[in-house]
């Protein structure tokens, strides 16, 4: 995700270590909500982003269901222990076991895991107008994720945007909008592959 947020100057004097307080509130606020999202991926060295959009349903993190509608239909489902990635056009489902390393590479999973945040990242916050900017800097130089910036509405504690850069220099952003409460069940966060599709396990 691309971000031009410049927080480093302020962080030297104003940023304070955050013991997960704001992110814990944000994680709690997400539970049982549905929102529209726009994802932008900008490869290193490129100025034009690849844009995708759809809807996302959050259970208690790390349970999530990301339904992409444009430009291609695909589905990501997370139950906390596994993820399912289904592309109807390819007739293939990829099932991945989420170990600690994989979890640390997925910012939305870190938001809901206080212990993993403390272990893997230095967390700081800055109040910026009507929003709180939370930054996660990896403790390990070899970390896949280099920098995460989370924009949280100060009044509702809802996440508005997540930006991050990976160690290859690629930028990714998720913008959330139109969040509203909805009924959720555990069945939403489990995926049964349709008959006739190829299943790849990782």
Predicted feature residues:
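Bacterial N-terminal signal peptides
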Residues: 4-17
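Flexible, processing/modification-adjacent segments and terminal tails
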Residues: 21-43, 47-49, 77, 86-146, ...
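Short loop/turn positions at the edges of beta-strands in beta-sheet-rich folds
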Residues: 29, 58-60, 70, 142, ...
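Short, surface-exposed coil-to-beta transition loops
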Residues: 51-53, 72, 79-80, 143-148, ...
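An acidic-aromatic
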Residues: 53-105, 172-175
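Gly/Pro-enriched, hydrophobic low-complexity segments
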Residues: 94, 116-202
